């Protein structure tokens, strides 16, 4: 594992970044570190971080930092502080005076100048440091919150920051023992100079002198093996540029692994305690103010004892890490005009948070996040969307992660999918968790597609894996049918569905008196049905019980396809004039289409499947059913000349209109992929009159969001998103065997060629253009320099008209799908 951390030698411009971005409007791009100038003129550090293991001792972990002074004119000093810590190891009873026994925390303890022992109930370790025989200064503290906030606190988790930045030597632990350890190196490098720093974590106590030559050999061997592995994986036809992009994409994907810990029941319990304390403090201070008002006039001096007030509320029953409960703004609000008096402290300290009023309990219950997800007990290593900016899992992001991952680590890909299907993640009702901000917000049901794809990409032999997935996915399918279908109409009301601001409406919100029938939710469910059907066909080769189950899913597919394809005035989602699928806002008296050409209306196209005729031999009930459906529903069930069955939600005549729109450069087709919203809305703002008082609107925004909807951090109103482009490319490729584009004015002859063009356009975002610049970097001239030109960032989404990267910049994550586009263009899919 290897990563580059590029850090300025000047003061990090926190305040400049904060103030400049606060001053910018929604019409302006984000002001980034690279825009501040602190990285100009080579005034930065290149810090390469590498991890490797020895074959002789695979439980021993080596790390090497290679630090380069990029400044060719001046020497510079860097303070390097590798850190090791245990997660908060504080038991809820640890600070209770009445607890009969205090649990012993694990700890790290210095044993000589460059080695520390690690004492832990899962095993004992040692960590040793070396830098050409230079000894570090070992620092120790505890990984616990500072109860004093900015006032300072001995032995707390921010002690190293205070030690380095504020030169406060008293905050670290002099006994050289704690739950957090740092090894401080002060490095002085000449212009253009470099140095290597090593440390090793060993699974036993050791006072070893590091053999740096042996360590270098370990890194050289692992690098050679990694190069051999990727050389065999990548097509011979790839040039160095393609290999460079793919290697960095895989590096980002593998670095996105993170230990994620969230126990909703425990979190909710602690939150309730916090709310009670806040409520108790507020009630007492409010009552005290009322009493003081009768004795004093005007504004009375602010109390300096609010911090102690908060921490004195029955502390015996509050975990240590929960002690500081009121932030500065809340303190100021509550203490704004109160008397400086020790009487306030004594009054508040007598409040018992257990005696909470009914109103307060109702308030806590009302504000309780994820209150219906108390079964969630997540303590696992999971691939994150972006470890820097989105350090929490999102269920449909993770489905995309598995596609490139299964090429390099198939076992991990299967494990991640089974994890999401387990009972500590999936709700007892069958719903998948969305993301931690609201587990109940539905994401597109793409886990079944990912399970099927991983099964096929890993050899199509692990039927036990597929069977395990199928039975758990059955619960999720039933949840969608029972909870999100509009009656028995075959249309669905998914809500959020991961596309943030793509509509004029906030699709996460509830509109009283209305139901939003969604083209994407309905399309996803048809797609879900076909994925389950394909699994049944595979599993029926070994167990005929799946033959009957297949009938269940084909019936649902036909029902949904028929409903979606009805004209809007007849209760469906197809607009006969615009030739597009739209969401429909339904009330008791009306059905009003939201006529926006976006990815929402393209998703029904994804519901497509081709089942080989030879596979139907062992599924006789399904084979007979399909023969009958061919006569009744010829638009959705077709047979090829080879005897294969083709299932499609979008009939051929409507597919022609959709593809025409998809291929049009003034609509969806951009030089860098398929847009999320038609460019038609650049000059034609769309307006939707919700009622007499509210008119909603949107327009084409090819880069960053031009509204604050969903926080303004993402944008589905024009930019190119690799996740949806991948699904469209894959679908067009599959359809290309049986359908051709009619009409020479549409350019390409087949859907397969259109898929290839999409892949090439996506790849062009990352490749240097005729001027040697990668479109994803925009106009940043630093990337013209030798030290920068080979670096690739994997942004969340991309400006549809320029290819410039937008949003989170380490989204590998689903932007690692560029690997699949590269394979597509190499004809190795």
Regions found by a protein language model. Give the residues of each.
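Acidic, mature catalytic/reactive cores of soluble proteins
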Residues: 1-285, 289-302, 336, 355-829
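Feature detects tandemly repeated or modular, low-complexity segments in exposed regions of proteins
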Residues: 294-370
């Amino acid at each position: 594992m290897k990563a580059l951390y590029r850090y300025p030698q000047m003061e990090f411009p926190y305040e400049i970044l904060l103030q400049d971005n606060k001053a910018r409007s929604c019409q302006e791009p984000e002001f980034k570190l690279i825009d501040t100038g602190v990285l100009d003129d080579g005034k930065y550090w290149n810090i390469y971080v590498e991890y490797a293991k020895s074959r002789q001792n695979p439980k021993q972990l080596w790390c090497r930092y290679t630090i380069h002074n990029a400044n060719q004119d001046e020497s510079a000093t860097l303070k390097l502080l590798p850190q090791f810590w245990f997660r908060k190891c504080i038991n809820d009873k640890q600070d209770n005076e009445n607890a009969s026994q205090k649990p012993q925390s694990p700890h790290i303890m210095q044993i000589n100048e460059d080695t520390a022992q690690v004492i832990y109930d899962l095993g004992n370790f040692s960590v040793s440091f070396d830098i050409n025989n230079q000894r570090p200064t070992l620092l120790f503290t505890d990984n616990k919150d500072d109860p004093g906030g900015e006032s300072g606190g001995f032995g707390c988790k921010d002690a190293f920051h205070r030690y380095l930045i504020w030169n406060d030597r008293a905050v670290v632990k002099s006994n050289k023992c704690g739950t957090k350890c740092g090894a401080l190196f002060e490095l002085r490098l000449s212009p253009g100079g470099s140095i290597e720093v090593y440390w090793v974590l060993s699974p036993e106590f050791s006072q070893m002198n590091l053999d740096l030559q042996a360590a270098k050999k370990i890194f050289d061997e692992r690098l050679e093996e990694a190069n051999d592995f990727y050389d065999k994986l990548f097509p011979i036809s790839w040039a160095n540029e393609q290999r460079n992009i793919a290697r960095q994409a895989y590096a980002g994907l593998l670095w996105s692994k993170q230990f994620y810990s969230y126990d909703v029941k425990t979190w909710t319990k602690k939150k309730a305690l916090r709310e009670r304390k806040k409520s108790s403090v507020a009630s007492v201070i409010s009552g005290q103010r009322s009493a003081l008002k009768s004795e004093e006039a005007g504004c009375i001096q602010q109390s300096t004892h609010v911090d102690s007030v908060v921490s004195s509320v029955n502390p015996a029953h509050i975990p240590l890490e929960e002690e500081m409960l009121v932030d500065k703004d809340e303190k100021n609000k509550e203490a704004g005009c109160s008397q400086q008096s020790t009487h306030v402290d004594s009054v508040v300290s007598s409040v018992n948070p257990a005696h909470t009023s009914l109103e307060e309990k109702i308030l806590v219950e009302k504000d309780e996040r994820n209150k219906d997800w108390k079964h969630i007990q997540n303590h696992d290593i999971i691939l994150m969307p972006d470890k820097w900016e989105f350090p929490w899992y999102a269920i449909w992001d993770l489905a995309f992660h598995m596609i490139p991952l299964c090429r390099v680590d198939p076992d991990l890909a299967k494990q991640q999918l089974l994890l999401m299907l387990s009972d500590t993640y999936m709700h007892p009702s069958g719903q998948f968790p969305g993301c931690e901000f609201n587990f109940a917000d539905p994401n597109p049901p793409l886990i079944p597609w990912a399970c099927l794809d991983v099964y096929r990409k890993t050899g199509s032999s692990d039927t036990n894996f597929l069977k395990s997935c199928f039975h758990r996915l059955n619960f999720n399918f039933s949840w969608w049918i029972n909870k999100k279908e509009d009656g028995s109409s075959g249309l669905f009301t998914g809500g959020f569905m991961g596309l943030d601001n793509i509509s004029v409406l906030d699709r996460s919100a509830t509109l009283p008196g209305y139901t939003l029938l969604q083209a994407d939710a309905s399309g996803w469910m048809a797609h879900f049905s076909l994925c389950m059907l394909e699994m049944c066909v595979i599993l029926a080769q070994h167990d005929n019980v799946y033959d009957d189950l297949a009938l269940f899913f084909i019936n649902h597919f036909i029902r949904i396809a028929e409903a979606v394809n009805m004209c809007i005035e007849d209760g469906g989602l197809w607009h006969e004039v615009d030739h597009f699928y739209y969401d429909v806002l339904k009330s008791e008296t009306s059905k009003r289409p939201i006529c926006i050409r976006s990815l929402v209306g393209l998703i029904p196209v994804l519901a497509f499947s081709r089942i080989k005729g030879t596979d139907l031999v062992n599924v006789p009930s399904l084979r007979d059913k399909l023969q009958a459906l061919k006569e009744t529903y010829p638009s959705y069930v077709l047979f090829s000349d080879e005897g294969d069955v083709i299932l499609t939600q979008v009939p051929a005549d409507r597919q022609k209109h959709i593809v025409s729109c998809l291929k049009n450069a003034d609509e969806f087709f951009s030089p860098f992929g398929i847009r999320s919203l038609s460019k038609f809305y650049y000059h034609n703002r769309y307006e939707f009159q919700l009622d007499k008082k509210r008119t909603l609107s949107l327009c084409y925004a090819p880069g960053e969001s031009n509204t604050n909807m969903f926080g303004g951090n993402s944008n589905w109103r024009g930019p190119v998103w690799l996740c949806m482009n991948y699904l469209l490319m894959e679908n067009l490729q599959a359809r290309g065997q049986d359908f051709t584009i009619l009409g020479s004015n549409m350019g390409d002859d087949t859907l397969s060629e259109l898929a290839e063009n999409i892949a090439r356009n996506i790849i062009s975002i990352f490749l240097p253009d005729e001027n040697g610049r990668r479109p994803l970097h925009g106009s940043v001239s630093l990337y013209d320099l030798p030290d920068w030109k080979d670096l690739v960032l994997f942004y969340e989404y991309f400006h549809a008209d320029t290819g410039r990267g937008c949003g989170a910049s380490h989204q590998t994550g689903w932007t690692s799908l560029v690997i699949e586009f590269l394979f597509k263009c190499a004809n190795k899919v």
